[in-house]
Amino acid sequence: MKKGTVLNSELSALISRLGHTDSVTVGDAGLPVPDGIQRIDLALTHGIPRFMQVIETMTAEMQVERAVLAQEMVEANPDIHRQLVTWLQRLAQTQGNAIHIDYVSHGQFKALSGESKAIVRSGECSPYANVLLYAGVTF
């Protein structure tokens, strides 16, 4: 049995295949997945797993250099926004690099998610609980 943090085989494989600047979208239960994009569906029921549980688990094994959020998240979901930004700041300290955070419209976000290697669906049922994570390098 795998001893690392990520036990889901699809998610573990995805993270191990990421190259520099590749992106992965982590989304709420309602984020659409464009045709041709891998869907890794972790949702069990409403709220399980939570968005931040997925983020915390993934970033334990993924080097992150950039994050893109929908600007609508700031007002429509301030609690998740605060938790995510705080987590990314802590992650940057742990990794020893800056993580740039960019904001785009939700429409632009959905278009960018179509360029992701995969969209990871959480069970989160709150508005705009989505982020694009861009892979960095560990050296």
Curated annotation (Swiss-Prot):
Key words, A-Z: Carbohydrate metabolism, Cytoplasm, Isomerase
Biological pathway: Carbohydrate metabolism; D-ribose degradation; D-ribose 5-phosphate from beta-D-ribopyranose: step 1/2
GO CC list: cytosol
Cysteines paired by S-S bonds: none
Keyword set includes Membrane: no
E.C. designation(s): 5.4.99.62
Pfam families associated with the record: RbsD_FucU (PF05025)
Function of the protein: Catalyzes the interconversion of beta-pyran and beta-furan forms of D-ribose.
Protein's UniProt name: D-ribose pyranase
Lineage: Bacteria, Pseudomonadati, Pseudomonadota, Gammaproteobacteria, Enterobacterales
